[in-house]
């Protein structure tokens, strides 16, 4: 299993104060020196709430690890990434809403302009992945447009797992639609969400599409996904950075790697 470390929220801390620390490159090399991280993931958002264009340039110039850049189909961002001298290892196209706290679901593959953006990256020799819900239509769209990777949105699975097996429902930011559900109902929905991820991962495998996954994964809910044999990569960020605040980044990375690289 490949471990993609998302370092967006290290930069979030920097941007809160508009200062120079924490240093994104220091985080990069801490990750590299653990010898457990396979790639670095960053999300270049339209609103630039964390990662900035300059961060992209600096990372691509010196990173010893592959860089996966998440982004929308925004024309300005597409032009910027296509113009880069140092190319990312892949671009993962994600849905984006300026009012969202975090990505809320998978990409709508009928989105106007999506096909043109995929072609633009392919023409520059940049591999494309699509951040999608685990659905057949998304896989067929990827296959039709020569997209060799998808990343399944695991938010539904993760939220259900957290509601059932952690104290998430008692926290200040509990998800209202899950808070009042009984354990039996949560368990059934969680089982179905996992089965859907497993079924669609198998479907993708037989279609020749590499399957990655991410969103909302943490030290508790990630273990079940290791039972999906066709899953090749997990991208995890917020939970690792959250733990790093308390125990340090190196230890937080190693603890996650111990779970997913067994």
Curated annotation (Swiss-Prot):
What GO terms describe the biological role, i.e. biological process, of this protein? pyridoxine biosynthetic process
Cytoplasm: present as a keyword of the record?
yes
Write out the catalysed reaction. 3-amino-2-oxopropyl phosphate + 1-deoxy-D-xylulose 5-phosphate = pyridoxine 5'-phosphate + phosphate + 2 H2O + H(+)
Q: Where are the transmembrane segments?
A: none
Q: What class of enzyme is it?
A: transferase
Site annotation (Transition state stabilizer) points to 151
Sorted UniProt keywords: Cytoplasm, Pyridoxine biosynthesis, Transferase
Catalytic activity, EC: 2.6.99.2
Q: Where is the protein found, in the record's own terms?
A: Cytoplasm
Positions of 1-deoxy-D-xylulose 5-phosphate binding: 8-9, 45, 50, 102
List the active site.
Answer: 43, 70, 215
HAMAP family noted in UniProt: PdxJ
Q: How does it assemble?
A: Homooctamer; tetramer of dimers.
What's the name of the protein?
Answer: Pyridoxine 5'-phosphate synthase
Source organism of this protein record = Helicobacter pylori (strain J99 / ATCC 700824) (Campylobacter pylori J99)
Q: Which gene encodes it?
A: pdxJ
